[in-house]
Amino acid sequence: MKDLLKFLKQQNQTEDFDGIRIGLASPDLVRSWSFGEVKKPETINYRTFKPERDGLFCARIFGPVKDYECLCGKYKRLKHRGVICEKCGVEVTLTKVRRDRMGHIELASPVAHIWFLKSLPSRIGLLLDMTLRDIERVLYFESYVVTEPGMTTLEKSQILTEEEYLDALEEHGDEFDALMGAEAVLALLQQIDLDGEVAQMREELPEIGSETKRKKITKRLKLMEAFAASGNKPEWMIMNVLPILPPDLRPLVPLDGGRFATSDLNDLYRRVINRNNRLKRLLDLVAPDIIVRNEKRMLQESVDALLDNGRRGRAITGSNKRPLKSLADMIKGKQGRFRQNLLGKRVDYSGRSVITVGPTLKLHQCGLPKKMALELFKPFIYGKLEARGLATTIKAAKKLVEREGAEVWDVLDEVIREHPVMLNRAPTLHRLGIQAFEPVLIEGKAIHLHPLVCAAYNADFDGDQMAVHVPLTIEAQMEARTLMMSTNNVLAPANGEPIIVPSQDVVLGLYYLTRFRINGLGEGMYFTDEKEVEKAYRTGVAELHARIKVRITEHVKNADGEWEPVTKLRDTTVGRAIMWQVCPKGLPYDLIDKPLGKKPISKLINHAYRNLGLKETVMFADQIMYTGFHYAMIAGCSVGIDDMVIPEAKYTIVEDSEAEVAEIQAQFDQGLVTAGEKYNKVIDIWSSANEKVSKAMMDNLSKEMVMNRDGEMEEQDSFNSIFMMADSGARGSAAQIRQLAGMRGLMAKPDGSIIETPIKANFREGLTVLQYFISTHGARKGLADTALKTANSGYLTRRLVDVAQDLVVTNHDCGTHDGLLMTPLIEGGDVVEPLRERVLGRVVCDDVLIPGTDEVLLPRNTLIDEALCDVIEDNSVDQIKVRSIITCKTDFGICANCYGRDLARGHMINQGEAIGVVAAQSIGEPGTQLTMRTFHIGGAASRATAESSVQVKNTGTLKLQNAKFVTNSEKHLVITSRSSELTIIDEMGREKERYKVPYGSVLSKNDGEAVNSGDTIANWDPHTHPIITEVAGKVQFVDLADGVTMVRQTDELTGLSSIVITDAAQRNATGKEMRPALKLVDAKGKEVMIAGTEIPALYYLPGNAIVNLEDGADVGVGDALARIPQASSKTRDITGGLPRVADLFEARKPKLPAILAEKTGVVAFGKETKGKVRLLITQPSGEVYEEMIPKTRLLNIYEGEPVIKGEVIADGPESPHDILRLRGVAPVANYIVNEVQEVYRLQGVKINDKHIEVIVRQMIRKCEILDAGDSTFLKGEQVEVARVNISNRELEAEGKQPAEYEMQMMGITKASLATESFISAASFQETTRVLTEAAVAGKKDGLRGLKENVIVGRLIPAGTGYSYHQERARRKAAALAPAVESTVSADDAEKALTDALNSDLLSGNH
C-alpha cells in the first residue's frame, strides 16, 4: 500500500518553479519530447473502435486506452505496471498519460513556421533583411534565391525568377547555388553569423544619419541580440520535425449511430500526414521536379493551416463550411485556453436561484432554500451522519439523505451553523459583487437577500438570479468570514462612503417618520423621555408628526474618552423621538432632528461608522431598515392622478412663449434674422418656458398653507405623495415630476438635434399622436444606448484591470519627499471639491505649517483623517503637499504611505493589498452609468453663453495669479498676459473663487483690493481679441498699403471708417512679403521702447484685424490699437461619458491639439512658407529654437512676448503626451485625474482621485532612453522606469555614468501589451504577436503579477497570498545564501541569526 501511495504521489509532482521561459524548440528537442513517430493518417478502426497502429491515436506511442491494460488484452491490472506488451507494444500504465505524451512527424522537406513568417514584423524577414513578399515567393515556390553566389556577379539572397535562374545557369554553370522553398530559407538562416552581424551593426549605428535607416537597423539589431542572448538559433524558425499534440487533448468521441465527433486538429494533422507521406513517395520515385515542388508547397500550406488557419490565403474549411480551428485559435480569444480555462474556471459546490427580499434577516444572513443547502453541503452531512453512527457507510448515508428523514435536517442545521456561504451576482463589477453570509434555512426555492446589500450587488427583485458558493476548507471559511462577510464591507472601496445605505421604501418610511405637521394631534405636549412619547403614540394620544417637547439624553465623550450623558429639553416631533430609540448611544441628536432623506441617512451611517465602530454601525443599519419598512407600511404613501397638480401659471407661460415665437417667425419671414438665429432663439424661449413651468409646479407641489392652533395660516412642507417620494430621495426626481405635471418640453431628433416645437402637454393631460410619435425616438435610443454601453463599459474595465493588475502595496514607506500639491478644485468661481475632500485619507509629504508662522501643524508622514481635516479647515490652510501614488519611488509596487487610507476599511492600507485591481474596478464599475453619446449641442440645451465679465459671489480680497497688466488712462488695470487667473481670497486667506481672465480684460479693482459679493470686477468683449499697447505715443503705420495689405470699410449706419487688414493668402506677390504693423513713436518721431526693455513697441497685425485709428493718432497706455474678430465659437460636440474616459486612459492625441511652447524664451516670427508660420523662440542661453506651425492655427502670442516652456501658444484640447514632455509628471497626472473626474462628476458618481492616479502610474511606467551612459540599454529603446532606476543605482554605486531617460506615456491597451510578463500580455489581446515576440527573445516570465499566478495555478501575490510569496522569496534567498558565506563576517552572521529567531518568534513558529 505504501508503495502505491508513493507511486501516486510522484505522479503529480510539479517542480517548484520561479518563472516560465518561452523559446523556439529545436528539432532535437521536439524528438526528445516525442514517444514515437506518427506515420499514418488513420485514427481508429471503425469496427473495433481501437486506435490504429502508428496512427494519430496509436496506443503504442501515446499510451493505453484503458487504465493498466494493454491493447490486445494480454496484460491487465496493476501487477503488470510498467510492462511493455511484446504483442501490441503498448506500455501498461494509466490512461492519463494520453494527455501528456506527444508524438512527432518527420517532415520530408523543411517547412517555415507561419508565426515567424507572417506575424508582423516578419521575424524571418528582419533577420534575412528581405521583404516578406520575396520570402513568400521563395517559400511557395515561385522564385529562386541565391544561397551561395560563388565567383559570379550574383549577390547573396538575390531573388531570381525561373527565366533568370536558367540564364544564370547557362552563364555560370554550377559556380553558384540557388534554391527555392523552405530549404533555401533554411540555408540562408544557417549562414547567419549572429555575433559578427551584431558587432558590425553596433559599429555602424553611430555613423548613420537618416532616421528611417537608423530605426530599421536598431530593430534588426534588437532582434539579433535577442537571438544571441536567448540561445535560440535562427534556423529553428524553419521546422524539420512537427510535434503532435497528445490525443486526449484532441479527442475523437463516438456518437450514437456510428458517427464520430472529432476535434478539428485531427483533420488538420491528417492533411499534413497525407501530404508528407505522398511527398516521401514522390522523392523515393525521383518524380519530376514540378510535381515534387507542388507537393512541397501543399505540405507547407497544410502545416500553415495546422498552426494558424486563415493567416495566409483562405482558411481551410471542414465539412460544415466553417473554418477549422487551428492550434493558434485554441489559445486566443474569449473562447481560447487563456480566457476560458485558465483565467475563468467553473467551480463545484455551487448553485443558483432567483432572489427575493429578506426584510427580516440580519445584515450578515441570507436565506438559503433547504433543497439547495442539502445538495451543497452533502459531503459534510455524510461525514456527520457517519460520525453520529446514524449511517455505517457513505452508501448508507446517501440513502438516508435521499429519504430526507428528520435526522437529516437536524444534521443539516448543525452543519451550516456558522459555515458562511458566498453569494455572487453577475456581472461582478467590483469586489462587493461577491460577499459572504451565514445561511438561514428557508422553505421555498428562492434565495432570500438582505435589502441593504442590494446597492452593492446592484440587485433588484424583478427576477435577478444569484449564485451560491460554499467555501470548503477551514482557511477558505476563515477568509470568507473575516474579509468577505457583508458586515465587513460597509464602505465602498471606490470612495470610502457607506454602501450599506437604505433606499426606496426604507427612506420613504424614515422620511415620513421624521416630518412635522402643523397642528397635529398632540401638538405642544411635554414628555419626560422618548419611551413615554412612544406610549402616547401607541395609545393614540399624539400622532407621528406632532410637534412636541421631549427630554433627550445624548452621550458625549469627555476628556478621558468615557461616555457622559447630557440631557436637555428639545423641540422635536413624535416620530423623531421614536427614531431616537433605535439610535446607538454616542450619536448626536442633531443628526436625526430633521426630515431624513437619503443624504442625511447616509451621513448618519457614516458618522456612526467613523465614531462608534463597525459592530454598532451594522446593528444600527439593521434597526434603521426595520423601522423604515414598518413606517413605510404605516404611511401608505400611494400615488393617485390628483397628486400631479398642474400649476395655474402653466397656461399663461405657454401662451407668452407662443407669442414670442410667432414674433421671431415674423422677423424671419421679413429676412431680419437667419434660419440659424431663429432656431437658436426659439429653442432658448422654450427652454426657459420649460424652466418657468417646472419652477411654478415645484413651488405649487412642495408647500401648502394650513391653519395652525391659533387659527392663522402657516406654510409647511406638503404631504403630497409624489413630492414626498422625490424630496426624500426614495424614487423619482424633479425632472420626472416635471413630465408628469409640468410640460414635457423639447425633444431631440434621431440625429441629436433638437426639434423646435416642444411637447406642451404633460403625462397627466396626455399626449397627442404627434407628440407621442416625437417622443418615441428618444425612448428607443435610450434602450439601444444601454445595450451598447454595457459592452463598452465592460471592455473598459477589462483593459483597466489588465493594466493595473500587478500593482500591489509592497512596503511601508519608500521615503520619498515628492508629492502632489493639493488645492481646492475650483471651476468658474465655484468650489467643486473642497480641500478636505481631496486630502482626506492621504499622507502629508512635508510638514504642514500654520499659515503665516513657522509652527508645525501636521508633521511629515501623518495620515489625514476626518478630525485632522477639521483642524486644517480651522487653521485655514489652503494647500497641502501630500504623498501620491504617482510620485512613489518603490520599484515594482507601491508603498503604504504614498497610498494612504484603505477606503473600504478606513485605516492605513495593509501591505499586500491589490490596489491596482481595486482602482480598476472602482473606475469601471460606474461605467454603465455614464452616457455613451457625444453631446450635440443645440440651442440652450447646454450651449454656454459667451462669458464677457466676472461677477464675484463672495466678499474678500482680489488677487491676480501670473498676470501682467498696465494701468490705462481711467486708472483701470488692463490685462496683457495670456493665462491670467483672478482669485478671491477670504479673510482667513483661503481661496474661494477662481476665474480665468483673457488678454485685454479691463478690471475695475486693483490687485489686493477688497471686493464685495455681487461686484462685477472684470469686463471684456467675448467676440473680438484686442491688441493692447503697453506704452503711450503716436501711432505710425508700417507696411499698411491701401488695396495691398488693407482695405477701408465704412459702416453704413455710423459713417465711421475702419481699416481691415487683408489675409496674407489673399494678397498679391508684393503684399505677401509685407508685414503690416503699428509702431509707437514719441512726439519727435523716435521709436518708443517697451518699459524696462530694449524692444521697440511694434505691434504686428494678423489678417482680418480691424484698426479704428488713423496714422498719427495719439494713444494712451492700455488702449486697444486693433481688434481681431473671433469666429463665434462653433458649438463643438463635446465628447462626453464613456468614450471620453476611454480616450483619456488610452492617451489618444486629440484632433487639433493645443500647441505648447517647447522652450522658455522670447518669441519671434521668421520667414513664412506656404501654409506655415516659422516660430522662433530665443532662449536665455541665446540658442534659437524654431518650429513650423500651420497658418490655420490662431496663435495667442505676439512678437517679442516671453513664453515659458509648456505654455499654450495655440488653443485647443491639450495632448497628455505634450503635457508630460514639457511640464512633467505631476501636471499630466493632474490633467488626467481632473478630466476623468469631470465626466464622472456630471453623472454624480464619486470616485477617489487615488484610483485614477493608480492607472496613470501604470501609464507612465515606461521611458525612452536618451543617453545610455555606461548601461546596457540602447538609445531610443523603451524600458520600464523601474529597470532603469535599478540599473542606474548600481552604476552610480560603481561610479559609472548612469543612463538618461525621458518619461513616456502609453495608453492602457498598449501598456498592458508592453508589460514585462508575456503570459499576462498574451492572455489580454493579440496573443499570436505577443507569443511570437516572446519566443524569439527567449523571454522569462517572473510571475510577478496576479494574472500570471492565476494562470499557472498559484496563490496570487496579494491579499492572503502575499505572505506565501514573501515566505517563498525568503526561503529562496536563504537557499542561495550559503554560496557566498566566505564574505560574511562573524557579526553579520550573529545579527542574521538573532533576526531569524526574532522573526520566528513573532510569526509564531516556535
UniProtKB/Swiss-Prot annotation:
GO biological process, one term: DNA-templated transcription
Alphabetized GO MF terms: DNA binding; DNA-directed RNA polymerase activity; magnesium ion binding; zinc ion binding
Coiled-coil annotated spans: none
EC number(s) per entry: 2.7.7.6
Residues holding Mg(2+): 460, 462, 464
This protein's GO CC annotations: DNA-directed RNA polymerase complex
Cofactor: Mg(2+); Zn(2+)
Keyword terms, alphabetized: DNA-directed RNA polymerase, Magnesium, Metal-binding, Nucleotidyltransferase, Transcription, Transferase, Zinc
CDD domains (alphabetical): RNAP_beta'_C, RNAP_beta'_N
SMART domains documented for this protein: RPOLA_N
Catalytic activity: RNA(n) + a ribonucleoside 5'-triphosphate = RNA(n+1) + diphosphate
HAMAP family: RNApol_bact_RpoC
Subunit and interaction comment: The RNAP catalytic core consists of 2 alpha, 1 beta, 1 beta' and 1 omega subunit. When a sigma factor is associated with the core the holoenzyme is formed, which can initiate transcription.
Physiological role: DNA-dependent RNA polymerase catalyzes the transcription of DNA into RNA using the four ribonucleoside triphosphates as substrates.
NCBIfam families: rpoC_TIGR
UniProt record similarity statement: Belongs to the RNA polymerase beta' chain family.
Protein known as: DNA-directed RNA polymerase subunit beta'
Encoding gene, per UniProt annotation: rpoC
